[in-house]
């Protein structure tokens, strides 16, 4: 195996480590995290880049927040996991800055820019809005090159936090980029919130940052045996895994496309009220969240467009983080996400109202978010491998990631606003520019809720199903 790696490796020699760099060992995580996360936020005020940079510099000099300015380096480790360290300079200089920040000034309006105008913007906040964002998914409007995955970061001497600010006559777009190996969306949201605290002069509200070397899963995995994990007998392996992979390859032949959907808060509230009314006929005190209802409603729309065989199993994974189990006084930035699994026959999902699926989603979250289940899941993963796959060979896999707790649409940059507008200076729209390549299941992200209570989602689905989904959303708009 080492001989094969020698002749097939394209790795470059990493840059020399600074003689006084402190080395922080990152926890091992699955290779799926070796990608970047790239997000574009649109503000309807012009922002002062100097104020944003100065407050960011100040944050990255505080305690373990400094580790965000470290350089990724690969270390020899188990090939099934990402083995990286952070090499943190003893001081940040012009040659080795804590972050990358580029600014572009344009005399044009945002909607006059050939790429910026493609960013979704709510035109009628009372309707379900549907955006084809294919042309807007260009991850940069100014950057010529940046590392695309963790290994490329390790071959550079670049800091992992990158920002591009595009100031227009009537607003600002900020492009945020970081390697996923460092943080999940909620962790990045905690970083952004700390940044706004510094910008707003609320230094006492900046939380202590948990160092990246502290493995959250190691804190938990030794307390409950692996056999206690609810799905420990549902590991997909061997021939069954091969069958599932072949089916997934076939279903990806036509390719996938991404769309953004903005759903009015009033529609989701009304749908939730109806869901609770339905459930109250069989439960004393039913509860489902707005997110449960949003996912259940749209997954049923997706199933109607895909029209899968009813005997197949829908495996709906819902990402949740485990920070609620950790001491609240510190900010835990590192990846802390687990998946709650809802497994149901497709026929049962489509023949029942959305309240049925919403209730099942909530049940899976309640069941798998307990401290005992998370501990058992950590112990089980230690036994079976760092990236197990649960389900059946015939399953229709649909992954959902909820970024709403990251609060990206609550980011208030008011003190940096050059042009003042009523209310807080928060993003008016959001776009996930992360590049998903290769074979993927059906995948959706709840990006968050905006200041007008609209829910933003971004879905990557089979190309052929989008026309039917758009017709269904148009029908809903006409009947409301």
Curated annotation (Swiss-Prot):
EC number: 2.3.1.-
Phenotype reported upon loss of the gene: Leads to complete loss of production of austin.
Keywords recorded for this protein, A-Z: Acyltransferase, Transferase
GO MF annotation list: acyltransferase activity, transferring groups other than amino-acyl groups
Keyword Nucleotide-binding carried by entry: no
Pathway connected to this protein: Secondary metabolite biosynthesis; terpenoid biosynthesis
One BP annotation, GO: terpenoid biosynthetic process
Active-site residues, Swiss-Prot/TrEMBL: 180, 412
Highest taxon of source: Eukaryota
Cited InterPro entries: CAT-like_dom_sf, Plant_Fungal_Acyltransferase
Record-stated family: Belongs to the plant acyltransferase family.
Known role: O-acyltransferase; part of the gene cluster that mediates the biosynthesis of calidodehydroaustin, a fungal meroterpenoid. The first step of the pathway is the synthesis of 3,5-dimethylorsellinic acid by the polyketide synthase ausA. 3,5-dimethylorsellinic acid is then prenylated by the polyprenyl transferase ausN. Further epoxidation by the FAD-dependent monooxygenase ausM and cyclization by the probable terpene cyclase ausL lead to the formation of protoaustinoid A.
Assembly and oligomerization: Monomer.
Additional notes on this entry: In A.calidoustus, the austinoid gene cluster lies on a contiguous DNA region, while clusters from E.nidulans and P.brasilianum are split in their respective genomes. Genetic rearrangements provoked variability among the clusters and E.nidulans produces the least number of austionoid derivatives with the end products austinol and dehydroaustinol, while P.brasilianum can produce until acetoxydehydroaustin, and A.calidoustus produces the highest number of identified derivatives.
Protein name per its UniProtKB record: O-acyltransferase ausP
Protein's organism: Aspergillus calidoustus
């Amino acid at each position: 195996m080492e001989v094969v790696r020698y002749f097939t490796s394209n790795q470059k020699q990493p840059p020399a480590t600074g003689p006084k760099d402190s080395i922080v060992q990152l926890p091992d995580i699955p290779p799926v995290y070796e990608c970047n996360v790239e997000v574009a936020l649109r503000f309807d005020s012009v922002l002062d880049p100097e104020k944003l940079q100065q407050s960011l510099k100040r944050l990255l000099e505080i305690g373990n927040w400094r580790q965000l300015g470290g350089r990724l380096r690969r270390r020899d480790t188990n090939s099934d996991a990402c083995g990286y360290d952070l090499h943190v300079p003893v001081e940040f200089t012009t040659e080795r800055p804590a972050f990358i920040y580029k600014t572009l000034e344009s005399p044009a309006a945002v909607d006059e820019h050939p790429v910026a105008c493609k960013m979704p913007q709510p035109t009628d906040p009372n309707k379900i809005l549907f955006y084809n964002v294919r042309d807007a998914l260009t991850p940069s409007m100014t950057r010529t090159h940046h590392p695309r995955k963790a290994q490329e970061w390790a071959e550079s001497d670049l800091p992992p936090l990158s920002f591009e600010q595009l100031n227009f006559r009537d607003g600002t777009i900020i492009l945020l980029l970081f390697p996923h190996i460092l943080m999940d969306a909620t962790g990045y949201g905690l970083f952004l919130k700390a940044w706004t605290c510094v910008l707003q002069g609320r230094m006492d509200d900046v939380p202590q940052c948990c160092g990246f070397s502290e493995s959250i899963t190691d804190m938990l995995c030794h307390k409950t045996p692996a056999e206690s994990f609810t799905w420990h007998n549902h590991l997909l392996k061997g021939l069954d895994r091969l069958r599932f992979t072949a089916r997934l390859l076939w279903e990806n032949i036509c390719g996938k496309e991404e769309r953004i959907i903005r759903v009015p808060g009033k529609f989701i509230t009304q749908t939730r009220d109806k869901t609770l009314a339905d459930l109250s006929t069989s439960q004393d005190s039913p509860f489902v969240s707005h997110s449960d209802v949003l996912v259940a409603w749209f997954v049923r729309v997706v199933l109607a467009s895909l029209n899968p065989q009813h005997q197949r199993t829908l495996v709906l994974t819902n990402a949740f983080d485990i920070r609620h189990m950790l001491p609240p006084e510190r900010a835990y930035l590192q990846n802390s996400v687990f998946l709650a699994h809802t497994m149901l026959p497709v026929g049962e999902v489509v023949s029942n109202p959305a309240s049925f699926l919403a209730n099942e989603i909530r049940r899976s979250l309640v069941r798998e978010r307990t401290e005992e289940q998370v501990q058992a899941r950590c112990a089980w993963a230690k036994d079976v491998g760092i990236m197990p796959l649960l389900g059946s060979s015939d399953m229709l896999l649909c992954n959902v990631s909820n970024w709403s707790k990251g609060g990206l649409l609550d980011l208030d940059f008011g003190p940096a606003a050059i042009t003042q507008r009523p209310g807080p200076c928060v993003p008016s729209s959001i776009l996930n520019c992360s590049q998903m390549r290769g074979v993927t299941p059906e995948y959706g992200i709840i990006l968050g809720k905006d200041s007008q209570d609209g829910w933003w989602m971004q879905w990557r689905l089979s190309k052929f199903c989008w026309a039917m989904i758009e017709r269904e959303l148009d029908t809903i708009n006409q009947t409301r």
